[in-house]
Amino acid sequence: MSGVEEKVSGTTKTPADFLKSIRGRPVVVKLNSGVDYRGTLTCLDGYMNIAMEQTEEYVNGQLKNKYGDAFIRGNNVLYISTVNMTVADGA
């Protein structure tokens, strides 16, 4: 088993499986520049190009802009993380 696979309840989960499972969910996309984009992941391709909806841009932890749709080129992406929603956030 390679270092990028994870055993979850008896099945092997790859990064591709994770990315498929988060489509339509709230995510944080961190860029190499340190800027964060938070919104709903709508599309992701093989080059890690990302389309998001209801996107907010954070610089140094502070909200700078809000966008309806955002398109991020994959070579700028450091990581993609899911957002844990709380009751106060509307989950």
From Swiss-Prot:
Expressed in roots, leaves, stems, flowers and siliques. Component of the heptameric LSM1-LSM7 complex that forms a seven-membered ring structure with a donut shape. The LSM subunits are arranged in the order LSM1, LSM2, LSM3, LSM6, LSM5, LSM7 and LSM4. Component of the heptameric LSM2-LSM8 complex that forms a seven-membered ring structure with a donut shape. The LSM subunits are arranged in the order LSM8, LSM2, LSM3, LSM6, LSM5, LSM7 and LSM4. LSM6A subunit interacts only with its two neighboring subunits, LSM3A or LSM3B and LSM5. One of its GO terms (molecular function) is RNA binding. GO terms for biological process: deadenylation-dependent decapping of nuclear-transcribed mRNA; mRNA splicing, via spliceosome. Component of LSM protein complexes, which are involved in RNA processing. Component of the cytoplasmic LSM1-LSM7 complex which is involved in mRNA degradation by promoting decapping and leading to accurate 5'-3' mRNA decay. The cytoplasmic LSM1-LSM7 complex regulates developmental gene expression by the decapping of specific development-related transcripts. Component of the nuclear LSM2-LSM8 complex which is involved splicing nuclear mRNAs. Belongs to the snRNP Sm proteins family. SMART domains: Sm. This is Sm-like protein LSM6A. It comes from Arabidopsis thaliana. GO terms for cellular component: Lsm1-7-Pat1 complex; Lsm2-8 complex; nucleus; P-body; spliceosomal complex. PANTHER family: SM-LIKE PROTEIN LSM36B-RELATED, SMALL NUCLEAR RIBONUCLEOPROTEIN F SNRNP-F. It comes from the Eukaryota. It is found in: Cytoplasm; Nucleus.
